[in-house]
Amino acid sequence: KPWERE
């Protein structure tokens, strides 16, 4: 998911 990257 784009908000669970780093």
Curated annotation (Swiss-Prot):
A GO BP entry is: defense response
Superkingdom assignment: Eukaryota
**Keyword RNA-binding assigned:** no
Q: Which UniProt keywords apply?
A: Amidation, Amphibian defense peptide, Secreted
Query: Does this UniProt record's set of keywords contain Secreted?
Result: yes
Q: In which tissues is it expressed?
A: Expressed by the skin glands.
Localization (cell): Secreted
Q: Which GO terms describe its cellular component?
A: extracellular region
Q: Which cysteines are joined by disulfide bonds?
A: none
Modification sites for Glutamic acid 1-amide? 6
What family does the entry list?
Answer: Belongs to the frog skin active peptide (FSAP) family. Tryptophillin subfamily.
Q: What is this protein called?
A: Tryptophyllin-T2-8
